[in-house]
């Protein structure tokens, strides 16, 4: 199962999953993706 948490450090509109994921790495998440509302969500297995 995958858990999602909105990124605390990501600024601006999320248009690149890669950008989002690299910010999430600094928040101790293994990855991240943009959602439909252009926000960055960090993901991890839970």
From Swiss-Prot:
It comes from the Eukaryota. InterPro entries: Defensin_plant, Scorpion_toxin-like, Scorpion_toxin-like_sf. Keywords: Antimicrobial, Disulfide bond, Fungicide, Plant defense. GO terms for biological process: defense response to fungus; killing of cells of another organism. Signal peptide: none annotated. The keyword Disulfide bond applies. Disulfide bonds join 3-46, 14-34, 20-40, 24-42. Plant defense peptide. This is Defensin Tk-AMP-D5.
